[in-house]
Amino acid sequence: MESKEILMLIDNISPHAKEYVEKAFENNQVDIIYSVSTVENMGVFIAVDNKDCCIFYAYFLNGNNIEQILDIIKNKTKEYILKFDSKEICFNVYGNNLKIINEVRKLGFKVDVEGYHLEFIGKELPNLNCCNLIDKGFKSDMLKEFINLFDSSYYQLYKDNGWRVNTNAINEEQFYKKLIDLDKHSQVRSFWINNELVGAYIFCQNYITDIVVKPTVQNKGYGSYILAHCIRNMSMNESIRNIRLRVAKSNTGAKKLYERNGFIEIAYFSEHTYE
């Protein structure tokens, strides 16, 4: 299978994975362990090996009747684990390949994150319906409010996934520097009711990295308004196309919100690290 075809398949795991593998091809760091392109199935199992880590990627369009593929994955992965006992080893799988995901976890890989990449495909920009939110950027005297907003908005999601909570309060100085830099490039907007911060968004390049709404004011339409504001800002003021975002698999409410507002799923990933 040619590298171009492989990259098209890896893109279904995530666009970032595709970019990483593309660079690895340029540096001759890709081991094409198995590939198939038939009427019954299309897929690939590769390893990208560099000085820092080894990352496996597996994508198969048809996840049924793949016992032979599972054996190849099991045996080859074991070989690499023995070979690189001191190197970090990761395994990124297409989210619909449940049999492969189960096999990977049997081999000792622990899930880091599972989720989707979505892309805005609306033919027209969303309207900004009348709302009582006041739009601002970020200033240094807003730091405490931003910390409380982001940590409270992500608390339940992070807790449910076993991730560290209250990370912005813990890394206050780092978060502050990040916000100052984002504001300098007009990549962060905050939304207020009177003097209360109730929501915000952050974007980087063509990705919306954060959409947060204060838990006590959720389900009032603020999320849709802030999302629409972000899309319009990125498109009209920054001339950004292919607006995308990443959402955790467990965050079903957010995924539904995005899909109601013109986003479609373009990739589905399940990322693991060997322990």
Predicted region positions:
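Short amphipathic alpha-helix that is part of the acyltransferase structural core
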Residues: 1-23, 129-167
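A conserved beta-strand-loop-helix scaffold within acyl/acetyltransferase catalytic domains
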Residues: 47-52, 163-211
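Conserved acetyl-CoA pyrophosphate-binding loop and the N-cap/start of the following alpha-helix
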Residues: 65-76, 191, 217, 221-230
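Conserved active-site alpha-helix within GNAT-family acetyltransferase domains
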Residues: 95-113, 224, 249-267
